[in-house]
């Protein structure tokens, strides 16, 4: 299994508005675009995210400072607001904010590469409109491959490769409501998912015919899985590089009604001890090795995560090794950038909403 990676970063400085005709060198431009999953579903260059997605991006746009390097910059809606919003968290975690830039400055930056939360048509169109060189942006063909790999079909295709003693899991792609009804009759209770959707959305725990027909009409199919009695959520975070797939760490996270709410911040050893209460660590290692060796992501380069879960089986627990593949950066990657070195120190990272989104870190009680 690959080694745990926790990118504590160097000190950066806030970038003041650029003077005209003065290029500021930026090694990597980071972008938090959490509406990415919905943008994939729309597949439109002129996509407008729902209000909640736009607000999440605006309120937490500073997040990449947690893993950015000294020569990097983070694209935000408002530079001053982003600098204020991240001050308390950065002080608490011993990090100094990196430089922030807004759209008006993009044409004045000498950018080496761009690392968004996830690539889609809408993001590329926005960057191009604001003066970013086309050579830094993915082609139509690359974006289409990313979109197809982000289809939940990819998870269903990987799942059989991860099956071994102690695991469970099936998933089927259906293109008609009749196929869904047949699976419902076979399994009794099923989960129906849209091929592309954001966290907590596009997932139904029934086979509502009208909803299924609508998703099939818009996205071409739905994914259907047997319902499993979940005990806990977790995931594995990876990075796809030119030399292969690298394991970055475990992600122990919490959800409410399918929507992400927070992560445990702990060392890999502490997280493995927690997971060992449910499933064999040898099984986790074997599944991780299969992902590294057998998952084919074509020419995709960047972070991605596999959502998994522990479920109740006959007389014990079973591992579902691939609930979903997120072909983008995830909150699990964010948690890894904040994880401690001390096995005794365990924190909780949470996202809450009270008129605005906030990310907080507190000690676990």
Give residue spans per PLM region.
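A long amphipathic alpha-helix within ATP-dependent nucleotide-binding catalytic cores
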Residues: 260-318, 355-364
């Amino acid at each position: 299994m690959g080694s745990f990676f926790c990118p504590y970063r160097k000190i950066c400085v806030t970038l003041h508005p650029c003077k005209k005709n003065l290029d500021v060198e930026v090694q990597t431009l980071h972008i938090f675009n959490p509406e990415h999953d919905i943008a994939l579903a729309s597949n439109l260059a002129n996509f407008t995210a729902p209000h909640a997605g736009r607000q999440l991006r605006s309120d937490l746009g500073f997040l990449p400072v947690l893993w950015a390097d000294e020569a990097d910059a983070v694209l935000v809606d408002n530079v001053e607001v982003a600098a204020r919003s991240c001050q308390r968290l950065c002080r608490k975690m011993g990090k100094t904010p990196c430089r922030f830039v807004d759209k008006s400055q993009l044409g004045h930056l000498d950018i080496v590469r761009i690392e968004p939360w996830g690539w889609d048509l809408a993001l590329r169109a926005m960057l191009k409109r604001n003066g970013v060189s086309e050579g830094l942006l993915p082609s139509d063909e690359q974006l289409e491959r990313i979109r197809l790999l982000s289809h939940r079909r990819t998870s269903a295709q990987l799942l059989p490769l991860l099956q071994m003693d102690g695991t469970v899991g099936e998933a089927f792609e259906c293109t008609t409501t009749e196929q869904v009804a047949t699976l419902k009759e076979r399994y009794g209770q099923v989960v129906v998912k849209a091929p592309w959707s954001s966290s907590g959305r596009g997932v139904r725990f029934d086979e509502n015919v009208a909803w299924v027909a609508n998703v099939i009409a818009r996205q071409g199919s739905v994914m259907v899985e047997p319902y499993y009695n979940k005990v806990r959520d977790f995931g594995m975070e990876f990075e796809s590089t030119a030399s292969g797939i690298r394991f970055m760490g475990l992600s122990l996270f919490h959800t409410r009604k399918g929507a992400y709410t927070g992560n445990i911040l702990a060392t890999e050893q502490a997280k493995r001890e927690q997971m060992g209460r449910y499933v064999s660590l040898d099984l986790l290692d074997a599944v991780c090795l299969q992902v590294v060796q057998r998952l084919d992501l074509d020419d995709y380069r960047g972070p991605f995560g596999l959502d998994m879960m522990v479920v109740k089986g006959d007389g014990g627990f079973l591992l579902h090794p691939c609930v979903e593949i997120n072909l983008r950066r995830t909150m699990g990657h964010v948690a890894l950038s904040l994880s401690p070195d001390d096995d005794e120190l365990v924190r909780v990272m949470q996202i809450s909403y009270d008129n605005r989104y906030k990310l907080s870190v507190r000690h676990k009680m």
